């Protein structure tokens, strides 16, 4: 875990260094979307399809996500890991509330989080 590459709100770090707020709507309400994106022999599998689905999921929940920036983050995460085979788990939540509430501010800033792990495909 200490050498697992991760990104949180655009800041790259190791997974054990990432700090997620307990008031994240991903944590309190599961108010988030995610995608698991595999790569094999340094090639991302069906990347455009994964990004399109992630974008559609964000739009369906009215998340204001910069999908181009997110796509670049995912590619950077894979590159930083220097892994040949693995997958990226990438999650986008509505954001962090000042206090837990079912109602949310329409202008809340989304929260992004992802990490990459090695996986032996068989």
Where are these regions (language model features)?
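Conserved alpha/beta cores of soluble small-molecule-handling proteins
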Residues: 1-122
